[in-house]
Amino acid sequence: MSEVFDIPANIASRCLINPKQYDAMYKQSIEEPDVFWSEQAATFLAWTKPWEHVSQVDMQQGQIAWFNGGELNVSTNCIDRHLPARADQTAIIWEGDEPTEESHITYQQLYERVCQLANGLRERGVKKGDRVCIYMPMIPEAAYAMLACARIGAIHSVVFGGFSPQSLQDRILDSDCRTVITADEGVRGGRIVPLKENVDEALSNCPNVHSVITVKRTGNQVPWNSARDVWYSELTADQATTAEPEIMAAEDPLFILYTSSST
């Protein structure tokens, strides 16, 4: 037996659609999927070039493509298109391991920090199509890293900060990452996680990695390879706060994400 809980009126009044509108949208999505998704893509995404085909499906070959011919950038859609109306509004609310550790990041701040890292990555030779491993704690810089990669067309691969050096190494090698973004240490449930040490151990068999960009999370001393490693703060400090986005095809890869086989 199930219970139905009615949505409070003060919340229902702020919903984008009502049940009748939802039913109509759902019906269209089933009966006219290309029309439906074309309307959604035009409404909610900023395109630099419109698509030629909404969807192309070959069930015999198992090939599916969306919005072929269209061009856009995920970073500009996540940040830039919101700036005219929301520059001073909060984009990210971050809370650290301790509830007292908190920060609110506006869209303008997010834009500038993402652009600074994007410029820093370009300075380190990262370009469109390159793979970047992100092995970080839950800090704002993790979001900046993903968005900065998207801005320059690099393909990011997020690896959970609780994974072992061997698991990290496997993912770096398989995805052919040449750059790693990490932190000196992470803090999880009051426990220190030796991220940079894990990265160094993982890279003992990853000869193609040429850059390790490290955020100072705890400030504790960590192993350092001056020929390869650079502090995140030093890389981004003097970078311009604007960065031209790379124009990407709709079917270009955005990220590589490995399952732990437990989900």
Q: What are these model-derived regions, one by one?
A:
Residues 1-24:
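Short, contiguous pre-domain boundary segments
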Residues 29, 79-83, 110, 114, ...:
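Adenylate-forming
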Residues 30-52, 70-93:
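A short N-terminal helical cap/helix-turn-helix that marks the beginning
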Residues 75, 92-147, 164-169, 228-234:
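Conserved AMP-binding/adenylate-forming core of the ANL superfamily
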Residues 78-105, 216-223:
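AMP-dependent adenylate-forming
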Residues 88-90, 212-214, 225-258:
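Conserved pre-ATP/AMP-binding loop-to-beta segment of ANL
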Residues 99-101, 256-263:
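Conserved adenylation A10 loop of the ANL superfamily
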Residues 151-234:
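Structural core segment of the AMP-binding/adenylate-forming
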